[in-house]
Amino acid sequence: MHAQATGQGAAPEGNARTPRVPSHCIALAGDIPGARFAALPAGAGPRTASRRARARDPLPEEMVRLSYLAHASFLIETPGGLSAVTDYTGFIGATDFFPDVATMNRAHETHWTAMPDPRIPHVLKGWGPTAEGVEHRLDLGEMLVRNVNTDIRSAFDETVDRNGNSIFVFEVAGLCIGHLGHLHHEPDAAQYAALGRLDVVMAAVDGGTTLDLPRMMRVLRRLRSSVVLPMHWFRGGSLERFVAAASAEFDIRQEGENSVTLSLRSLPRRPTVIVLRPNYLRAPQPD
């Protein structure tokens, strides 16, 4: 296994001193000597309330904002000012902003770039130089970013590139947030265990170039996430077909915005699909 980005990384001023609220991410914590599940404070529990806000606005403590930028790219922001962009393509909008972390998958050019912004401190590729894959465990204090390797179909034939892609997991503010990437197969038992309990999952719902709809629904049932954020949908009704299939098991919220702000305390009681509308970042406008 090719290991990268392990240990403490550079972070914006103040974040190194911001402790990370432990998540209950790892499903096998009970089997690891000395490991414990995080306990919620008294009175904590899932609530249906979550609020929307513009990307890059200041965040209250223990809140995380997820903004849908385009295709499979989301901006994840923390109260301490850390940020990560998933499936980074080199363009996130008409802005000079750059994230602290960029993750990439190599399924297509719409999921990665060979020329990332050199100002980004941590660019995490979801693939390694060999079939052994890559291992990321980037600890920025307030946020931990790690990956679980998955296989990928070749873009040129029917062969399979073992460990050629990754599911990225972001542990922040007590939440476990997963980005399934360009997923081509259902995870096996070991991969599910490595992912752990995802509170929030970003899932490709095109039903064609990634998993077909029945298999993606099986994955989401297995993950049992509180919030599902659909991504990677195209014209022709792929989003509508997913929403129709999910509506029997999930509450559906059509936000009409590109951002949602969540906390461990505000997770919905019933598993919920939150449909965000993609929108690139823009430079702040003068008042």
Model-predicted regions and their roles:
Residues 228:
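Residue-level signal for inorganic ion chemistry
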Residues 2-153, 175-180, 199-203, 236, ...:
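Metallo-beta-lactamase
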